[in-house]
Amino acid sequence: MNNEILQRMVENLSEEKFGRTFQHRAYFNKRLRTTGGRYLLKSHDIEINPKQYEHYGEDAVVKIILHELCHYHLHIAGKGYQHKDQDFKRLSQQVGAPRFCNSIESYQQRANYEYYCTKCHAKYIRIRKVDTNRMRCGHCNGKLRMKRQLK
């Protein structure tokens, strides 16, 4: 799937499910890491994570598009477009747009560092490096030490 096919898919879904046209750009953005897609407020464009298509196929992309189109149409109409707004919740339920997409990598797979407590030996895995002078064990308040760097 390329950007042209994605653009047509977004335009068709907008007409079918919302009865309104999509007049901006939709494209894949390979820099997206932790989200399936996003709606850009300033340019009104929609970006989709290509990894979602590679891992879960076209059905996952359709669900992400529906979710982002809810943001798009509500924002254009001047209604509540954020996840917390009732307008968004109502519209996403009407069109069958999910609140979340499937994650590509679990936290365990993304983790880079493993720490342990010197007192109770509790294990902590983290994506980002932790300042062991400032952070303490959540169980016993003991000191943390880096056990190993995973990647």
UniProtKB/Swiss-Prot annotation:
Record-linked InterPro entries: SprT-like_domain, SprT_Zn_ribbon, Uncharacterised_SprT-like
Signal peptide boundaries: none
Biological process annotations from GO: response to stress
Cofactor: Zn(2+)
Molecular function terms from GO: zinc ion binding
Keyword vocabulary terms for this entry: Cytoplasm, Metal-binding, Zinc
Disulfide bonds: none
Annotated Gene Ontology cellular component terms: cytoplasm
Binding site for Zn(2+): H67, H71
Compartments it resides in: Cytoplasm
Catalytic residues (UniProt): E68
Co-factor: note: Binds 1 zinc ion.
Annotated SprT-like domain residues: 6-147
Protein family membership: Belongs to the SprT family.
Protein name in UniProt: Protein SprT-like
